[in-house]
């Protein structure tokens, strides 16, 4: 968490620089020196306000998560409360559009996932994000399925989102958002059909 007093105009500048450097050289080689040069600030500013590279990565991920949450919330607000299938699609879509689909954002996500396995603070951020996604999905799926079925399908969709993201970061062409939506919707439709026959 950045210290109080960090000029608000500098945060986006540093977050953008962090992602650009990670995109170019990878997380391990993304030094404070390279990031500060990319952002046009002194290394002292980063160390003072963020306590170093770890703090800056944490703030970068917080910003990515804020953008993701804002995108999904905005899409859901634009839809009727009872348009459950559309709302599920909006949740899925929010993970693959605009800011989230940028290659440098995808690579930062991958670095974050890798780091979060061994870092409690980053692991906590990952859990918050996972819980939020599952909560959104469960809420809509429970209107279409039993609670147990909704839980299984929510985890299935979340796993597909994560898997497609991972494959996208390793693909030189990046994430293919249209294909991702087709794959996940195919899974969702098959699950809804399968469970409707079990009633």
Swiss-Prot record:
Protein name, entry field: HTH-type transcriptional regulator BetI
Ranges of the DNA-binding region feature: 31-50
Gene: betI
Domain HTH tetR-type: residue ranges: 8-68
Protein's pathway: Amine and polyamine biosynthesis; betaine biosynthesis via choline pathway [regulation]
Alphabetized Pfam families for the sequence: TetR_C_6 (PF13977), TetR_N (PF00440)
Single Gene Ontology BP annotation: negative regulation of DNA-templated transcription
GO molecular function: DNA-binding transcription factor activity; transcription cis-regulatory region binding
Function noted in UniProt: Repressor involved in the biosynthesis of the osmoprotectant glycine betaine. It represses transcription of the choline transporter BetT and the genes of BetAB involved in the synthesis of glycine betaine.
Keywords from the named record: DNA-binding, Repressor, Transcription, Transcription regulation
Keyword Isomerase: no
PROSITE patterns per the UniProt record, alphabetical: HTH_TETR_1, HTH_TETR_2
Transcription regulation as UniProt keyword: yes
């Amino acid at each position: 968490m950045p210290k109080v007093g960090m000029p608000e105009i500098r945060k986006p500048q540093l977050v953008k620089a962090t992602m650009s450097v990670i995109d170019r050289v990878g997380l391990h080689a993304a030094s404070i020196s390279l990031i500060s040069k990319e952002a046009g600030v002194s290394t002292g500013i980063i160390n003072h306000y963020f306590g170093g590279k770890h703090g800056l990565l944490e703030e970068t991920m917080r910003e990515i998560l804020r953008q993701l949450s804002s995108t999904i919330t905005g899409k859901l607000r634009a839809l009727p409360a009872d348009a459950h299938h559309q709302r599920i699609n909006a949740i899925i879509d929010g993970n693959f559009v605009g800011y989230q689909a940028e290659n440098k954002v995808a690579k930062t996500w991958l670095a974050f996932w890798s780091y979060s396995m061994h870092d409690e603070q980053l692991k906590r951020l990952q859990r918050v994000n996972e819980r939020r996604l599952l909560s959104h999905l469960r809420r809509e799926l429970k209107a279409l399925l039993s609670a147990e079925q909704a839980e299984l399908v929510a985890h299935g969709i979340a796993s597909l989102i994560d898997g497609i993201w991972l494959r996208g970061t390793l693909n030189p062409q990046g994430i293919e958002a249209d294909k991702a939506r087709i794959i996940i919707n195919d899974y969702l439709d098959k699950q809804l059909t399968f469970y409707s026959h079990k009633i």
